[in-house]
Amino acid sequence: MGFLRFFLTFLFGLGFLFPVSAGETVWYDYARSRAIPVKICFPSPVKKAPVILFSHGIGGSIESCAYLSNAWTAQGFVCVMVQHPGSDENIWKGKIRILNEFKGAYEENWSSRTRTEDLRFVLDCLERLVQSNEQFAARIDMDRIGVGGIDLGALAALLLAGQVPPDQGSSLYDPRIKAVLALSPPVRPMNISYRQVYQSITASALFITGTKDDGIVGPTKAEQRRIPFDAMRQSQRYLITLEGGDHRIYGGRVISFLGGKDDEKFQAGIVRSSSCFWRAVLREEPMAIRAMNSYDWASLVGVKASIERRSAQSTLVGSGSTMEIALPHLNRD
């Protein structure tokens, strides 16, 4: 317990001393005739830093989940927030029947193929910037890339990491991805087993869901959100299930009085756990690795939650276990 208190003091004390600068732009993918809004948040002082690519949920934008991008950037990560035309805020702004717009856009974008191709395009643009511009080369580490997202954004992140696409078309795997954060991942049955769907993912993964995390416009039920975690076999992975957490805790509520009294607590827990995960996997920080493998990891989350961990090819290691699991390819102190 003493170590975790010390680490949390470090994580949210010294870890937040980095000032933040941000810039917005639109990158045009001529091959697909798509304009992709992007917001890049850089930490200061200037030094090469790992990259976190983030994909919003249905109806979101580059401003979605600012609580995450602000926190991660303040801890020294480059955050790249990507907006997806066709499933972004423009589907509902100025509309009367908002729920119908959400449902229609969700079904049209269910496979997340277009979203995933957006993310790959943004990664390609970043690579070109690093190769052609010394200032970007000094700030962006393309060898340490993580990707995260909410719902359809989480699906896009998993597709980049090697999940079989829902449309069972060509693979969207991108070997540049080293870590995945899946917030409320959606699941639908296919004509192959879930083990086959997720078996190729090798990147370390953190899944976060809630006990009330039923889809609002999508069909996934709360108890199904854990399926990717259970089905994966080749990845070091973690699952946090927040007690009482619903589907709106991640990106905010359009109507603020519809619940949400504990949203700030849930979001603080998401920040704490995801920040520790990124620091362990992308920066290989010994204290973060120790915290991720702590017997009392629930203290890191800070809210009531169940915590589960599994290593590659392992059986379940649940909360309260006395087994310590080492993250693969990471240096231990």
Model-derived features: positions:
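Bacterial N-terminal signal peptides
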Residues: 6-15
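A domain-start/cap signature at the N-terminus of enzymes
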Residues: 20-42, 177, 308, 321, ...
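Serine-hydrolase catalytic machinery in alpha/beta-hydrolase-like enzymes
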Residues: 30-140
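Structural recognition of the beta-strand scaffold that forms the well-ordered cores
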Residues: 38-40, 51-54, 78-83, 144-148, ...
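Active-site rim elements
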Residues: 105-110, 191-194, 257-268
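Primarily recognizes the serine-hydrolase "nucleophile elbow" in alpha/beta-hydrolase
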Residues: 122-200
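The feature captures the conserved acid-bearing segment of alpha/beta-hydrolase catalytic domains
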Residues: 170-244
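Alpha/beta-hydrolase-fold serine-hydrolase catalytic core, especially in secreted/extracellular enzymes
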Residues: 244-248, 252-333
